[in-house]
């Protein structure tokens, strides 16, 4: 399977769990795509079936904080379409799950289904 994993790439528990899950799935032959703003700290070197897609937060002067959720949504749509992902595994409800939900709606409007 081609699996996208959305996570915080830091040393926190959820980020470690998601990274280790992806690495274990890669060992079993799955193609893993980590989608986040920085390479996960526990990822180490990329392998032939492990990819990292950087989400670059835009700097928009109107907002006090960068609109990460919207940028992540756009990146998820792009990665699902161009890498032909089978599934997204998403850690954290906000902003990751809400971004994944928006991406799913956009993809469905284009005839692309992802669970």
Which positions does each model-derived feature cover?
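N-terminal subdomain of nucleotide-sugar transferases
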Residues: 1-41, 48-54, 83
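Hydrophobic/aromatic residues located in beta-strands of well-ordered beta-sheets
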Residues: 32, 113-115
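Short secondary-structure capping/turn micro-motifs that flank functional sites
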Residues: 41-42, 96
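Short secondary-structure transition/capping segments
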Residues: 45-47, 101
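Active-site donor-binding segments of glycosyltransferases and PAPS-dependent sulfotransferases
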Residues: 54, 58-60, 64
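An amphipathic, basic-hydrophobic alpha-helix
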Residues: 62-87, 97-98, 102
């Amino acid at each position: 399977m081609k699996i996208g994993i959305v996570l915080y790439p830091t040393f926190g528990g959820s980020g470690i769990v998601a990274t280790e899950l992806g690495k274990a799935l890669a060992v079993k032959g799955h193609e893993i795509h980590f989608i986040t703003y920085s390479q996960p700290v526990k990822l180490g070197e990329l392998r032939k079936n492990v990819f990292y897609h950087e989400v670059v937060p835009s700097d928009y002067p109107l907002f006090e904080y960068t609109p990460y959720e919207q940028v992540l949504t756009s990146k998820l749509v792009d990665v699902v379409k161009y890498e032909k992902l089978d599934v997204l595994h998403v850690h954290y409800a906000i902003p990751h799950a809400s971004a994944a939900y928006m991406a799913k709606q956009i993809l469905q409007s284009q005839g692309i289904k992802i669970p």
